[in-house]
Amino acid sequence: MIALYPGSFDPITFGHLDIIERASRLFSKVIVAVLKNPNKTPLFTPEQRQAQILLSVAHLKNVEVDTFSGLTVAYARQRGARVIVRGLRVLSDFDVELQMAHTNKLLAPELETLFLATASEHSFVSSSLVKEVAKLGGPIDHLVPPPVAQDLRERFPLT
């Protein structure tokens, strides 16, 4: 069964990677799909994020990385995915994700949403937090995979 793990991943964190690794054990194929959102100004381009993720998941043979725009359910159908995987860090994530799952179910009744609780050691990590710490020159190696840490250091050089 194919699962889709969509997100902005700007940048991918160890929390995201935890969800990807666990989903890869549950499904025959996991597609990590980087959303191209024209309404947002990301730090990294979709192609840069795709490259970061590819390097971070190279050890997972059943994980593919792609980019997409538009409705997640339309992309899931196009790729033959039957499940949308979502990670939950804190209770407030559940509120937003449940609303999205209900909306997706209305749009595509054949798709299921699977919520995976992020490992406790990653429950505080968000892409926004990582960018803020990197911007202020703080340590990030415990928050993101090495290729991402390198890209962040290049983006926010210490002065």
UniProtKB/Swiss-Prot annotation:
Its cofactor is Mg(2+). SUPFAM superfamilies: Nucleotidylyl transferase. Its main location: cytoplasm. Substrate binds at S8, K40, T72, R86. Its EC number is 2.7.7.3. ATP binds at S8, F9, H16, G87, L88, R89, E97, H122, S123, F124, V125, S126, S127, S128. InterPro entries: Cyt_trans-like, PPAT, Rossmann-like_a/b/a_fold. GO terms for biological process: coenzyme A biosynthetic process. It is found in: Cytoplasm. GO terms for molecular function: ATP binding; pantetheine-phosphate adenylyltransferase activity. It catalyses: (R)-4'-phosphopantetheine + ATP + H(+) = 3'-dephospho-CoA + diphosphate. The keyword Nucleotidyltransferase applies. It holds the Pfam family CTP_transf_like. Gene3D superfamilies: HUPs. This is Phosphopantetheine adenylyltransferase. It comes from Synechococcus sp. (strain JA-3-3Ab) (Cyanobacteria bacterium Yellowstone A-Prime). The gene is coaD.
